Amino acid sequence: MILSGKEILKNIGSNIIIEPFDEKKINPNSYNLSLHNELLVYENDILDMKTPNPTKVIKIPEDGLLLEPGKLYLGRTNEFTSTSKYVPMLEGRSSTGRLGLFIHVTAGFGDIGFSGYWTLEIFCVQPIKVYPNVEICQIYYHDIHGEYDLYSSGKYQNNKGIQPSLMYKDFEK
C-alpha cells in the first residue's frame, strides 16, 4: 500500500528522513524532490560495464542548461533521504514527462534502509532547458510485509553526490 501525504508527514523525522524538508512539497501521496545544480556526463561514447567509465561535471547555471536528446545526464536530488520502515520509490513528475524529460531510465525502485541522495538518470526526447532546484521528481513510499533486512551495505548506500554506474564492482565478486 502507498503511504498518503499525511502518513509521510507523520513519519518525517523517524521512519522517513528528507533533508532539507519543506512541508509545501507534500502531495496527496508523495513528496516533490528537486534537482541539484550539477550533472555528470560520460566522457566516452562507448561504455563498458566491466570498468569504471570516466565522467565530467557540468554545472547548471541559474539561467538554465540546454539538454541534448540522445545523451544521458546523471543528476541528483538536493534532498538526502533515508527510510527504515518503508520502500522508497522515485518517479518523474507528470509536468516533466509532458515535456519529454525522463528522470530515471530504470532505477526508480529503492530498498528499505537506503540512505543517500537519489541519482537521476536524465534523458530527453527533444532539446529542453533545465534549471537548478526545480522540483523535478517525486518520492513515494510503500508498506512492506513480512520479515526483511535493511539495505545497509550496497555500493550506493550513504552516497554524498551523483553516482555513476558502479556495475563493474559486480564483476569483481
Curated annotation (Swiss-Prot):
GO BP term (any one): dUTP biosynthetic process
Q: Please tell me whether the keyword Hydrolase is annotated for this protein.
A: yes
Sorted alphabetically, the keyword list is: Hydrolase, Nucleotide metabolism, Nucleotide-binding
Catalysed reactions, semicolon-separated: dCTP + 2 H2O = dUMP + NH4(+) + diphosphate
Instruction: Write down the InterPro entries for this protein, in alphabetical order.
Output: dCTP_deaminase, dUTPase-like_sf, dUTPase_trimeric
Which leading EC class covers this enzyme? hydrolase
What's one Pfam family here?
A: DCD
Database matches in CDD domains? trimeric_dUTPase
Q: Name one GO molecular function term.
A: nucleotide binding
Q: List the disulfide bonds.
A: none
Which Enzyme Commission numbers does its entry carry?
3.5.4.30
Positions with a binding annotation for dCTP: 93-98, 111, 119-121, 138, 151
Which catalytic residues are annotated? 121
Q: In which pathway does it act?
A: Pyrimidine metabolism; dUMP biosynthesis; dUMP from dCTP: step 1/1
The protein's site described by Important for bifunctional activity is found at: 108-109
Q: Could you tell me which NCBIfam families the record lists for this protein?
A: dCTP_deam
Quaternary state and interactors? Homotrimer.
Q: Which family does it belong to?
A: Belongs to the dCTP deaminase family.
PANTHER family xref list: DCTP DEAMINASE
Q: HAMAP family of this UniProt entry?
A: dCTP_deaminase (MF_00146)
Provide the function of this protein.
Bifunctional enzyme that catalyzes both the deamination of dCTP to dUTP and the hydrolysis of dUTP to dUMP without releasing the toxic dUTP intermediate.
Name used for this protein in its record: dCTP deaminase, dUMP-forming
What species is this protein from?
Clostridium beijerinckii (strain ATCC 51743 / NCIMB 8052)
**Taxonomic classification:** Bacteria, Bacillati, Bacillota, Clostridia, Eubacteriales
